[in-house]
């Protein structure tokens, strides 16, 4: 994934502030919300936003990269848990429910868009050890591959159809249950 150039600590802090603000604004108003709302929410000037990000797409890409980095950190925190694969899917479902606009944007991107290839690759690499452990422990069918992760993510994304946080959470849990049963070795 693209790494921003090394910045001064205060610039890094402002970048994180802007990303937090963008996540909150996009969650509340969608990814097409005016960028001025992000500036106001972050409590910075418009010039600060544009020093950090050239446009809306740069903000969205940075949010996606941050989301993937957090997924990777979550995977590492699970160490060698046999059910880490399903715990990662649960974490992904929670993120989808908490950031529906970003999740919807992520799902709408082309699988062939080179800007998102590093993020997609990191997701696959993040899930691979957990998938292999789950398969070794008989929790997941042997024919499930990392290339299936975007499909599973899309199934979890169906939770976005809920009209409230509670309904989205219920739908995400239902999707997780269906996925778990469908991936079980005895489901074939």
Predicted features and spans:
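Amphipathic C-terminal alpha-helical segment
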Residues: 98-103, 133, 150-169, 180-188
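Alpha-helical DNA-contacting segments of helix-turn-helix folds
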Residues: 53, 57-67
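Short linear capping/connector segments at secondary-structure termini
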Residues: 104-113
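Basic, helix-initiating cap at the start of DNA-binding domains
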Residues: 1-32, 36-41, 58
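Short hydrophobic/aromatic patch on the recognition helix
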Residues: 43-53
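Hydrophobic alpha-helical connector segments
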Residues: 62, 72-98, 112-115
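Amphipathic alpha-helical packing segments from all-alpha helical-bundle domains
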Residues: 112-154, 161-162, 170, 174
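Helix-turn-helix/winged-helix DNA-binding modules
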Residues: 30-31, 51, 141
């Amino acid at each position: 994934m693209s790494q921003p150039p090394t910045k001064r600590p205060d610039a890094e802090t402002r970048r994180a502030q802007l990303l937090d603000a963008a996540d909150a604004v996009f969650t509340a108003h969608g990814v097409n919300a005016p960028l001025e709302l992000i500036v106001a929410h972050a409590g910075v000037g418009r010039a600060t936003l544009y020093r950090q990000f050239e446009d809306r797409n740069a903000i969205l890409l940075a949010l996606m990269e941050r989301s993937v980095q957090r997924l990777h950190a979550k995977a590492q925190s699970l160490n060698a848990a046999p059910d880490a694969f399903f715990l990662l899917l649960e974490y992904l479902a929670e993120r989808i429910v908490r950031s529906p606009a970003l999740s919807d944007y992520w799902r709408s991107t082309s699988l062939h868009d080179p800007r998102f290839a590093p993020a997609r690759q990191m997701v696959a690499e993040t899930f691979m050890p957990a998938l292999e452990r789950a398969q070794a422990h008989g929790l997941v069918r042997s024919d499930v591959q990392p290339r299936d992760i975007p499909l599973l993510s899309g199934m979890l994304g169906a939770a976005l159809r809920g009209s409230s946080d509670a309904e989205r959470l219920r739908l995400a849990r239902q999707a997780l249950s269906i996925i778990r049963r469908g991936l079980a070795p005895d489901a074939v």
